[in-house]
Amino acid sequence: MRASMVRRMAAAASSSASSSLRPAPLALLPPIPLYRRLLRAHRKHLPAEMRLLGDEYLKSEFRAHRNIDNPAHLIGFLTEWQLYAQQVEGESWLGEKIDQAKVEKLSEQQVGQLYELMMAIKSRREGGEGEGQESP
């Protein structure tokens, strides 16, 4: 009886220790199901203007990365898009800033693209607010 209790306690301790020390691995979706999930998330959770911008960006990124040969790049690409899908579906991303560590890893071209995206969002917001103020 004592040995079985020790085994149960050891099993419980090892399972809780392993789960608390490292998160469970994220099961990556294949590219096409992930792409469809992202489009559905945009359709369900984003306003029309943001959806159009998001869908265009999503399509261009998936097209640009269609022929990736490096497995590390593929895993990184799919992981980040899957995390994005979870954020959009959970709506925890609203008003959230980009992690500084991720910004530091961006290339100059990516920083430029991010800046262009920020300016497009700002101009759409200002355009939308201006239209709302003009109508009586």
Swiss-Prot record:
Transit peptide, UniProt annotation: 1-24
Pfam families, per database record: Complex1_LYR_2 (PF13233)
InterPro entries noted in UniProt: SDHAF3/Sdh7 (IPR008381)
Superkingdom in the source lineage: Eukaryota
Subcellular location, principal: mitochondrion
UniProt KW keywords: Chaperone, Gluconeogenesis, Mitochondrion, Transit peptide
Keyword Metal-binding: no
Protein's GO biological process: gluconeogenesis; mitochondrial respiratory chain complex II assembly; succinate metabolic process
The name this protein goes by in its record: Succinate dehydrogenase assembly factor 3, mitochondrial
Native source species: Pyricularia oryzae (strain 70-15 / ATCC MYA-4617 / FGSC 8958) (Rice blast fungus)
